[in-house]
A protein has these predicted regions:
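A short, well-structured juxtamembrane/interface segment
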Residues: 34, 97-102
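Short, glycine- and charge-enriched coil/turn segments that flank and shape catalytic ligand pockets
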Residues: 54-68, 100-109
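Glycine/small-residue-rich loop that forms an oxyanion/phosphate-binding "nest" at active or ligand-binding sites
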Residues: 58, 64-97
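A short, local hydrophobic-aromatic micro-motif
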Residues: 46-47, 70, 136
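Structural motif
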Residues: 30, 49, 90-92, 111-113, ...
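Boundary-proximal intrinsically disordered activation/regulatory segments immediately upstream
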Residues: 1-59
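RNA substrate-binding interface of SAM-dependent RNA methyltransferases
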Residues: 42, 103-142
Length: 142
């Protein structure tokens, strides 16, 4: 069990949570909460951290049955968590990388192609709308 915020794994986790540059350099991101953990493909998981309280629940242990995880002291988990009331589970996830060939493969390819979107709010709206319309990928310039 991890009992200190000085633990190397916790330091790395904190850095990933706080620094976009670090996430980009390592091709990793962090998800928090039961729903987000459940939606993350298992093969993309690079690490799972759970609080003592979380793992003491039988249903939660079933959720973790197919993945290795680290138990973190409740106080340490609260310190590293990004939310006001943590659910008790954080996962480090590998960012998938797709080539254009990957996106064009398949019978039902529907791409949203964007150029020079300046407002992040507009980008989010377009992606959510596209998802509702059944897009299978997004292509955009920097």
């Amino acid at each position: 069990m991890i009992t200190s915020t000085s633990n190397q794994q916790i330091k790395k986790l904190s850095l990933l949570m706080k620094k976009a540059k670090e996430r980009k350099e390592q091709d990793l991101f962090v998800v928090e909460g039961v729903k987000m953990f459940g939606e993350a493909p298992r093969e993309w998981l690079a690490g799972v951290y759970v609080s003592e309280q979380f793992v003491s629940n039988e249903e939660h242990r079933k959720l973790l049955s197919d993945v290795p995880y680290e138990i973190v002291a409740d106080s340490v988990f609260r310190a590293v968590s990004d939310t006001q009331t943590p659910q008790g589970i954080l996962a480090v996830v590998r960012m998938p990388k797709y080539t254009m060939d990957d996106m064009l493969r398949g019978d039902q390819t529907h791409l949203l192609i964007l150029e020079s979107v300046q407002d992040p709010g507009n980008l989010g709206t377009m992606v959510r709308t596209g998802e509702g319309a059944g897009i299978t990928g997004v292509v955009m310039n920097r």
